[in-house]
Amino acid sequence: MQRLLPLLLLLLAPALPAAAQARDDVFPYALKTERLPNGLTVVRVPFRSPGLVAYYSVVRVGSRNEVEPGKTGFAHFFEHMMFKGTKKHPEGERDRIVASYGFDDNAFTTDDFTVYHAYGPTAGLDALIELEADRFRNLEYAEPSFRTEALAVLGEYHKNESRPELKMEERLLGTAFQKHTYRHTTLGFYEDIKAMPEAYAYSRSFFERWYTPDNTIIFIVGDFDDAAVMKAIQEHYGPWARKAAQLNMPTEPPQKEKRTAHIDWASSTLPRHVLAWHTPAGSLTTPSAAIQSVLAAYLVGPTSPLYKELVLEKQLAEFIGSDFYPHRDPHLLNLIATLKAEDNRAAVDAALTRAVRELASGKVDAARVKAIQSNIRYGLLMNLEAPDDVGVQLALYAGIFGTPDALSRHLQNVSRVQPEQLVAFARSYLVDTNLTVLTLTPANGGKQ
C-alpha cells in the first residue's frame, strides 16, 4: 500500500463558518463508545447519510511492532493475508459477499497501526459485521497461499523501489535510527521480504499476538440502528478472547552529531533535499504533537515566506513541505525540498537553515501561527463531508494515540499552541547535533 497517512492527516481547507468555530467541542459529531468485556472498543457515530455507512477497524500493530531480527514487514503482510478467508468463508467468498452489496473495501498499514475499512449501503451492515468478526477471530490460510502472497509482497516492493521515495525513506530512517524499529519502513527490509515465504509458522504467531480485541478499535459511521448494531457486534465479536502481547521496544539512543546520507539515482528525476530532526513521540497529554503539526506548516507550508521565496519567486524548488505526522514513539520532523536543479542545492539548504535559526532566535510571526492553527483545525473538519471521511480521520488519530476521541483532543491541543512554544521547540530539537541530512542526485544532474 502507498503511505497516504501524511496527506490524510494534513488536509487543509478554508476555515469553517464563525458559528462552527465557536464550538467548545471541536469535533461536530457525537461518539457513542462502548468497551466489550473482551476489551474490544466499539465507537458509533450517527451521521446524516441515508442508507450509507462506513466501517473502520483499527488494529494497533504496525512496523513498529517488528522487533524480532529478520522478521520485518509482517504488519504490512497481514494487511494482505486478512483478505484470504476463514473456514466459514473460504478465500473468495468474503469478496463476493462484500461486492454483492456494493461496498468499497480496502486496508492500509503504517508504522504504528493497520486499518481495514469498508464503505457502502447500510443494508449490508449485518453481513459485514459477521464477515469482519469472523476474519478477525478465525483467519485461516494454508502454507501455499501464504507463500504466494509473500511473493506478491516482494513484487510490491520491487514496484515501489522504482520510485525515489522508497529508497529515500529507507536511507533516511536507516541513518537517523540505530536501535528503534522505526529504522525500517512499513514494507520492511528487503532481505526479510525475500525470506518471508519461509516464515509461515511465524506469521501465525504474529496474528495471534496482535490481532486481539484489546488491541482493536472499531468505528461505525453513518446511518444505522444503534441497538441492532451493538447486538450484532456482541454476538459476533463477543467470543473473541485473545490478549495482545507485551512488547519490549528498543530505545533509540540520543543522536550526538549531525548525520548525512546520499543517494545517486540512476534515472531521470528532480534532485531532493531533506533535513530531519529527532523529535518527541505523539501524545495527547503533552503539546509536542500539536507543536510539530503547527511548526511544519509554519516553516515550509504554502503560506510560509520560504515557500514564497524558493518556489514562487526565485523558483529554486519545485516543491517544499513536510510529511510530518505524530508517531507513537519519538520519530522525525522533516523539511523536504524538490529542487529544480542540482545547482540550487546550496541555496535551498541555506534558506531552510536560515528559517530554522531565525525561529530559534525568537523571531516568530504570531498572526501567521494563529492562521495556521485555524487552517489545520477547521480545514480538516471542513473535509468531513461523508461517513467515510469521518471514519478515516477518527481511525488515523485513534491508531496513533490509542483513544477514540484522539482527533478532537489533538485539534484542541493544536488550538492551544503558543508562538513561544515554537521557538522553544526549535531551540531544543532543531539543532545540528540532532539533524540528519539526506540528499538525492539523479543521473542527469536534475536537468529536465
Residue spans for each PLM region:
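N-terminal secretory signal peptides that target proteins for export/translocation
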Residues: 1-2
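Bacterial N-terminal signal peptides
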Residues: 5-15
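His/Glu-based metal-binding/catalytic segments typifying zinc-dependent metallopeptidases
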Residues: 58, 158, 245-305, 397
